[in-house]
Amino acid sequence: MVREQYTTATEGICIERPENQYVYKIGIYGWRKRCLYLFVLLLLIILVVNLALTIWILKVMWFSPAGMGHLCVTKDGLRLEGESEFLFPLYAKEIHSRVDSSLLLQSTQNVTVNARNSEGEVTGRLKVGPKMVEVQNQQFQINSNDGKPLFTVDEKEVVVGTDKLRVTGPEGALFEHSVETPLVRADPFQDLRLESPTRSLSMDAPRGVHIQAHAGKIEALSQMDILFHSSDGMLVLDAETVCLPKLVQGTWGPSGSSQSLYEICVCPDGKLYLSVAGVSTTCQEHNHICL
């Protein structure tokens, strides 16, 4: 409380003070003062609680000058130790693991990796789901350690760059269209079978088709006819013995039949030719073919 008194004094003159003195009170009193103190006390309590929560959060989250917990900030980017769970999409230029450990990506639903262009459109996608792995791109390629293409797929063709393509399934390999390859070979001590259940099987090559069995036999079975046709060359059966075990045996017919009969003749070099049959052999008469 402040009191102000106005008194005029002159040297040598005494002036009596007035009986009524005016007192002016400046400040906050009563319930307003109590509310102000209560508000200040509440601010102090909130400040202390905030400071305590800040210290607790810093301690729980493992904040340090290098980063937060297992997440460290380096000059090359962010380094994350241990296992982490991302609840929202992760955008990064490069993700790699430590030198002494592998990189593991897992999810309860699927793992999707997208590549986008400058306009935000998806240009490539790799989706690993519970039932299949889906790749969406113009070309899919697998390379070896030295950069050699091992497997390439695009809209036009599938290229296998390995030295050998091995199919181990019990049903083999099923091709709906043509297959182009320089060699078809079975595993050692296993049979090689080429089959077309409902259509024909064709093997074409501009410089010849070579079929060889080193330790077994080659068998061709057909319900209908088996035809060997050579337009410009000849058919060669190169073997010590040529057997035709199921040839139909002829029967005696009426004499003087007009039906033309021929006999098979063999040249010294193995060439076969037909000769008109007679009472005796006529091969000698047509042996000019062997010359």
Swiss-Prot record:
<dbReference type="GO" id="GO:0060047">
    <property type="term" value="P:heart contraction"/>
</dbReference>
<keyword id="KW-0812">Transmembrane</keyword>
<dbReference type="GO" id="GO:0016012">
    <property type="term" value="C:sarcoglycan complex"/>
</dbReference>
<comment type="function">
    <text>Component of the sarcoglycan complex, a subcomplex of the dystrophin-glycoprotein complex which forms a link between the F-actin cytoskeleton and the extracellular matrix.</text>
</comment>
<dbReference type="Pfam" id="PF04790">
    <property type="entry name" value="Sarcoglycan_1"/>
</dbReference>
<dbReference type="GO" id="GO:0048738">
    <property type="term" value="P:cardiac muscle tissue development"/>
</dbReference>
<keyword id="KW-0735">Signal-anchor</keyword>
<dbReference type="GO" id="GO:0005856">
    <property type="term" value="C:cytoskeleton"/>
</dbReference>
<keyword id="KW-1133">Transmembrane helix</keyword>
<keyword id="KW-0472">Membrane</keyword>
<feature type="topological domain" description="Extracellular">
    <location>
        <begin position="59"/>
        <end position="291"/>
    </location>
</feature>
<keyword id="KW-1015">Disulfide bond</keyword>
<dbReference type="GO" id="GO:0007517">
    <property type="term" value="P:muscle organ development"/>
</dbReference>
<feature type="disulfide bond">
    <location>
        <begin position="265"/>
        <end position="290"/>
    </location>
</feature>
<comment type="subunit">
    <text>Interacts with the syntrophin SNTA1. Cross-link to form 2 major subcomplexes: one consisting of SGCB, SGCD and SGCG and the other consisting of SGCB and SGCD. The association between SGCB and SGCG is particularly strong while SGCA is loosely associated with the other sarcoglycans. Interacts with FLNC.</text>
</comment>
<comment type="similarity">
    <text>Belongs to the sarcoglycan beta/delta/gamma/zeta family.</text>
</comment>
<keyword id="KW-1003">Cell membrane</keyword>
<feature type="glycosylation site" description="N-linked (GlcNAc...) asparagine">
    <location>
        <position position="110"/>
    </location>
</feature>
<dbReference type="InterPro" id="IPR039972">
    <property type="entry name" value="Sarcoglycan_gamma/delta/zeta"/>
</dbReference>
<keyword id="KW-0206">Cytoskeleton</keyword>
<feature type="transmembrane region" description="Helical; Signal-anchor for type II membrane protein">
    <location>
        <begin position="38"/>
        <end position="58"/>
    </location>
</feature>
<dbReference type="GO" id="GO:0010467">
    <property type="term" value="P:gene expression"/>
</dbReference>
<keyword id="KW-0225">Disease variant</keyword>
<dbReference type="InterPro" id="IPR006875">
    <property type="entry name" value="Sarcoglycan"/>
</dbReference>
<protein>
    <recommendedName>
        <fullName>Gamma-sarcoglycan</fullName>
    </recommendedName>
</protein>
<feature type="topological domain" description="Cytoplasmic">
    <location>
        <begin position="1"/>
        <end position="37"/>
    </location>
</feature>
<keyword id="KW-0325">Glycoprotein</keyword>
<dbReference type="GO" id="GO:0005789">
    <property type="term" value="C:endoplasmic reticulum membrane"/>
</dbReference>
<keyword id="KW-0963">Cytoplasm</keyword>
<dbReference type="GO" id="GO:0005886">
    <property type="term" value="C:plasma membrane"/>
</dbReference>
<feature type="disulfide bond">
    <location>
        <begin position="267"/>
        <end position="283"/>
    </location>
</feature>
<keyword id="KW-0947">Limb-girdle muscular dystrophy</keyword>
<dbReference type="GO" id="GO:0042383">
    <property type="term" value="C:sarcolemma"/>
</dbReference>
